[in-house]
Structure formats: structure tokens, C-alpha cells
From Swiss-Prot:
Subunit annotation: Homodimer.
Gene that this sequence comes from: get3
EC numbers on record: 3.6.-.-
Keyword Metal-binding applies: yes
GO biological process: cellular response to oxidative stress; pheromone-dependent signal transduction involved in conjugation with cellular fusion; post-translational protein targeting to endoplasmic reticulum membrane; response to heat; response to metal ion; retrograde vesicle-mediated transport, Golgi to endoplasmic reticulum; tail-anchored membrane protein insertion into ER membrane
GO cellular component, one term: GET complex
Localization in the cell: Cytoplasm; Endoplasmic reticulum
Active site: 62
Organism expressing this protein natively: Aspergillus oryzae (strain ATCC 42149 / RIB 40) (Yellow koji mold)
Full protein name: ATPase get3
Organism classification: Eukaryota, Fungi, Dikarya, Ascomycota, Pezizomycotina
Signal peptide: none
Class of the enzyme per the UniProt entry, highest EC level: hydrolase
List of residues binding ATP: 33-40, 244, 271
Main function: ATPase required for the post-translational delivery of tail-anchored (TA) proteins to the endoplasmic reticulum. Recognizes and selectively binds the transmembrane domain of TA proteins in the cytosol. This complex then targets to the endoplasmic reticulum by membrane-bound receptors, where the tail-anchored protein is released for insertion. This process is regulated by ATP binding and hydrolysis. ATP binding drives the homodimer towards the closed dimer state, facilitating recognition of newly synthesized TA membrane proteins. ATP hydrolysis is required for insertion.
Keyword Zinc: yes
Amino acid sequence: MSTAVVQADDLMEPSLQSIVSQDTLRWIFVGGKGGVGKTTTSCSLAIQLAKARKSVLLISTDPAHNLSDAFGQKFGKEARLVDGYTNLSAMEIDPNGSIQDLLASGEGQGDDPMAGLGVGNMMQDLAFSIPGVDEAMSFAEVLKQVKSLSYEVIVFDTAPTGHTLRFLQFPTVLEKALAKLSQLSSQFGPMLNSILGSRGGLPGGQNIDELLQKMESLRETISEVNTQFKNPDMTTFVCVCIAEFLSLYETERMIQELTSYNIDTHAIVVNQLLFPKQGSECEQCNARRKMQKKYLEQIEELYEDFNVVRMPLLVEEVRGKEKLEKFSDMLIHPYVPPQ
């Protein structure tokens, strides 16, 4: 067999068609450095998935919440249909929701004569002094909610790189918090529960045992989902970058971390590429294209077994259904620059 044929066979398709076609996928994460077009890519991928699947949910865990801006409609904590679609919904969640919000099932502590003692708050503070517990419980609560909804596939528009992979550590964080709370409960629980009475002094009138049960159920949810995250048939991670040194460096760091957690990643979307016409006299365009070409070659070399999608720098912002659909087509049908 000739070398040319081998290379043609080995060449990975420069599109996300394989992800859209893989009907076993349940979780798709889209991540990368800030400002590289993550939200545009995740919205566009969700649009393509909506053509192939019965129901798609797009979730933003980025505190900046750009989904509303991208689609030009307001989204919140509850999933709602995207205008113009019957099977694509979106929601924006705050990954740093407070423990009070998570555990409180009702208000009215002001009527409780024991609430002023602060013993419940002290227990809560001790239990949640472990870094990341707040975020872990919030994420687990979201997963619990999402699991109860019957969406075929869920696309996460994640926070910038530094925060993207925190969810992988959440089961461990929750286990630590549970161990700490169990220890406190076995030592002081019966005494505190009897002192505080049936109100328990914790948010929503829960006692310490109920708090433990709540955390245990969240830990089980997040552990179960994390097992799915490590299954390449069910989960994949799409990296988004631009052809610049820092973005490429972040992408490499992220891919190494994903690999260490056994999370599948085999697609990179390279945004904002310049394609100056032959003979163009725009010096800046040509200089930038030369730089981008260098980093593109590095990406092709480093990730030869990845689907590398090349997306052009557009003259207008990608906002609104029409422009997102146009952009989403280029994720599937590779962009051909005009000659």
C-alpha cells in the first residue's frame, strides 16, 4: 500500500460529525480558555445535535452566563426551550450556589428560639470548611436535577479552563466532608439534636442526621455520574482554542488532565482563523496568518489522532439563531476559504 493511501486513511475528519453521529453519548463538555469562542461552539454543537437527537439540553456553568446573549433570550435555573426549536432547551446555573440555598427546604428560622444559639451554624461551618464543598454540592444538585429530566444528550458550556475540571474532584471532596460530618455527628449529634429539639437548628429545620443523608445522596449521584463521565461511549470533551501560544498551552494542559482522569477527548475546534486572499496587501492579516499557520501545524502534529476543526474569523459577532445555525454548519461541513 502506498504512503499516500495510508495517510489518507489515517487522516481524521476535520469536523464534529463523529460526535453528532455517536448516539450513545449522554454528556458532552465544551471547554477552553476564556474568549476563544466556547459558548458559540457549544450553542452551535447543541443546534447540530438537535437535528440528530430527540431532546438536547444545553447548560452553562460559566458564571458569565453567555447563553442568553448568544441566543438573544433569557435563560435561568430552570430548563426552557430555545426559541425556534422544539427539542433544544437551555439553562444557566450558578456553580457557586450557597449551602443555605441547597439545604434549606423552608424559611422561618426567625420563629425558632434556638436558632439564635448558632450551634447549627457552627456544625454547618465545620462541615463545610473543606475547600470546594459548596461548589461540589451545588454541582451534585444540578446533576441530580438533570438526571431526573429525560434529555437524550446534555451539552455543558463550561467555565474557563481553570474551573472546568473541578467537577472531577467533587466525589472526593464530598467524601471528605461526609467523613468530617459523620465524625462530628457521632461525637456530638445526639446531644445537639436533643438540645436543639426537633428543629435541629440547621437550615429548613433539618437535624444533623438529615443533613448527613442529604450529603450522602448527593455524593452517590455525583459518583454515579462521574463513572459515566469516564465512559467514552457516554461522555466526550470538546476543546476550543485559538491558534496562539497561550491558548495552545492551556489546551495541552487540559488534555493531559482529562487523560489522567480517563475522560475521552478527541476533538479540537480552532476558532478565529484568518484566510487572507492570495496576493492580499494587508500586512497585519498576512503576519497574523503566518503566526496562526505555525501554531496550526503544531496542533496537527500534537493531535494527529484528533478531529481538528478549523473555523474562520467572521466579520460579525455570532449572535442569534440564524448566525449560530450558519456557524454550526461549519462544525460539520469543513470551511473552504475563498481563493
